Amino acid sequence: MTDERSAIYTHGHHESVLRGHRRRTAEDSAAYLLPHLKPGSSVLDIGCGPGTITGDLAAQVAPGPVLAIDQFADVLNVAHAEIQRRNLSNVTFATADVQSLGLRDDSFDIVHAHQVLQHVADPVRALVEMKRVCRPGGIVAIRDADYAGFIWFPRLPALDLWLELYERAARANGGEPDAGRRLLSWAQEAGFDEITPTGSLWCYATPETREWW
């Protein structure tokens, strides 16, 4: 279901997209969060996609419960299969919109979202919702992309054009492809007062990763 607050998910769920998303792990996408994970902690994983990061988080907090949500039921089926493959029993799934979660206040020790806010029409509203469902003393953990920060060498006109077109398409669809640089401002606007900004990157430099990219 969509409304005036919804953005179009620019990436879609073609197998080529899912293949890239399956490469993601908690170690390469949420390393900043790992030291804070404890057995028994409850986790809300927002925009879980195919579930690889979800599975890593669930293994770290087991037997603590993990609720993995996504706006798209089809990709939740993919995530469910991933969790079954890992024989994890502490994960449940639900469809939900991060801008209106429909969950009780103070429900989770950790609320996590990786590369979600770039696709959301109202990221501040989404952050307010994340804050609402996080328990006092808990952690809202956000990491997001910043496409304007992409660099490559040698410069290739085709990649320059791709980046320009992607950013235009993402914004036309209601998203913000340079969400990363805006996270601090959004969090402040959403009412967070204890904020620890950090950054990370992916480096595609080996023959394997260059071929994949």
Show the residue positions of the predicted features.
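A short acidic, Gly/Pro-enriched loop at the edge of an enzyme's catalytic core
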Residues: 99-110
